[in-house]
């Protein structure tokens, strides 16, 4: 049974959430009650994450053959707990990988296949990964972090991490031909707390890959501005700022405003909508700032200088 202080702390945390995050929690198919799983591991990275991703990456390229023809450009492989001997926090008995060789697909954790076994590990974790992606390891870290979050929730009795078709998440990620609807979806997606955790894990992987090129604070800034996380937030924030600069047409403004109201069940006007979106993005960027110095210290050869504060927000705001 949980200590009284734990329950109090969880309730305080839930009450501190803004309406957007509460709305998300109420629309996903999990029990809505105080739950400390939202906090998860510090920085969204658990011990063993990088080693697990590296082992998976190595296995993919051991199995892949440049001379073999693959049906529909895909192949599948399975790894077992014993394949990760010596790596901490292996939370599954089996890891099933669906590997796509095309350049147009992304990566995803397929959570509906994850169920707890008698030993309290997932029987099987399924991840879809595209080996056409640059720096595959960081995407593996991203999806493994989602799987780990799911495992943590199910250990604590949360029903599912998988979301209903009619959930807010599904509405956010619904494919669309409208460019600004896609932008809106990306903004809402990037500011989900679960995604921010995963991007922290991904950013950690990106930093490790470039650590040998970092010799000064200027090198660090240049490197960080090339990461997917920085470029993604920069692009989205710039589009929102175009509204403030009167660079969006009425049609573009109406598309974003109407779609945002539809998804969130609100009736905001255009000014309120763009102010809300900008606030969401800036809040997420500041959260990345809070952990970036720690990540730089852990992942880069920079013990002899201090990581500049507010790295992301200094260059984005």
What residue ranges belong to the model's regions?
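Enriched but not universal
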Residues: 1-15, 312-317
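Structural signature of transmembrane alpha-helix termini at the membrane-water interface
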Residues: 26-27, 148-151, 218
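Active-site recognition of the HExxH zinc-binding catalytic motif
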Residues: 138-151, 198
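Auxiliary, metal-adjacent structural segments of Zn-dependent hydrolase domains
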Residues: 18-121, 132
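Post-HEXXH active-site segment of zinc metalloproteases
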Residues: 134, 150-184
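Short pre-active-site segment immediately N-terminal to the catalytic Zn-binding motif
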Residues: 124-140
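Long, well-structured alpha-helical subdomains associated
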Residues: 16, 23-24, 33-37, 43-44, ...
């Amino acid at each position: 049974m949980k200590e009284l202080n734990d329950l109090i702390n969880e309730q305080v945390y839930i009450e501190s959430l803004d309406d957007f995050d509460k709305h998300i929690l109420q629309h996903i198919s999990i029990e809505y009650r105080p739950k400390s799983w939202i906090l998860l591991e510090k920085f969204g990275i658990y011990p063993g994450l990088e080693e697990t991703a590296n082992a998976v990456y190595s296995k993919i390229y051991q199995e892949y053959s440049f001379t073999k023809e693959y049906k529909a450009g895909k192949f599948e492989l399975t790894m077992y707990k014993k394949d990760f001997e010596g790596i901490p926090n292996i939370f599954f008995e089996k890891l099933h990988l669906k590997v796509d060789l095309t350049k147009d697909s992304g990566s995803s954790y397929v959570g509906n296949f994850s169920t707890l076994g008698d030993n309290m590990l997932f029987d099987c974790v399924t991840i879809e990964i595209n080996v056409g992606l640059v720096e595959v390891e960081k995407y593996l870290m991203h999806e493994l972090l989602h799987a780990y979050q799911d495992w943590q929730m199910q250990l604590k009795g949360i029903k599912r991490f998988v979301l209903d078709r009619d959930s807010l998440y599904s509405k956010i990620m619904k494919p669309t031909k409208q460019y600004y609807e896609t932008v809106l979806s990306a903004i809402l997606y990037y500011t989900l707390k679960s995604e921010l955790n995963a991007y922290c894990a991904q950013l950690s992987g990106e930093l490790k890959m470039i650590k040998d090129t970092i010799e000064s604070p200027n090198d660090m800034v240049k490197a960080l501005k090339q990461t997917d996380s920085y470029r993604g937030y920069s692009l989205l924030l710039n589009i929102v700022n175009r509204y403030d600069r009167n660079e969006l047409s009425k049609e573009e403004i109406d598309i974003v405003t109407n779609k945002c109201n539809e998804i969130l069940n609100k009736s905001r006007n255009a000014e309120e909508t763009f102010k809300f979106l900008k606030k969401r993005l800036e809040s997420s960027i500041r959260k990345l700032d809070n952990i970036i110095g720690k990540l730089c210290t852990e992942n880069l050869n920079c013990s002899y200088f201090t990581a500049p504060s507010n790295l992301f927000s200094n260059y984005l705001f």
